[in-house]
Amino acid sequence: MAATILTAGCGKPSTPSGGAVAPPADNTAMAATPISQPALTAWRQGDKAGAVAGFLAADWSAHPLFAADSALSLSESQFKALSDADRQAKSTELTTQLGVFKQLAAAVTQAGQEAAAKGDPAQARKCFTALKQCGAALAGPDSSSLVQLVGQALSKRADTELGKLPQ
């Protein structure tokens, strides 16, 4: 019993009596890689193409969007509950992190515009659709007001660009 608890706590499946491993009943209990992490990591490493590819591959309807320790992961109520000093520190962190994220989103927009200019509306649509899905995710109720505003702006930009593409 103790071995089962210890191995389950490490994220390793236990195999009672050597039988097949059953999948966990609740996948949300496992720590998931934040959706934005692969794209943001590539961006920070200077890999623009990899960052855009990671952004396009992301499932923006999944969670968590950002790492738990990121200011971007705070809801508005969590942000307001911080002490004045912590709120100021998180505000600075939030502004910096949003700046990086907006640069990545601009690169995705640019990739879509370049695809459209080269006569590849399918790739352009993929870029703008990912941008719109990201915007919708950021604009959700689990985000801070500032992150929601950025999400709304991304969705609006995506709609504008999608409207320019041939049907």
Predicted regions and their residues:
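Sec-dependent N-terminal signal peptides
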Residues: M1-A2
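C-terminal motif of bacterial Sec signal peptides marking the signal peptidase cleavage site
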Residues: L6-G9
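Short, conserved catalytic or interaction motifs in soluble domains
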Residues: K12
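Aromatic-rich surface patch/π-platform used for binding flat ligands and interfaces
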Residues: T15-Q167
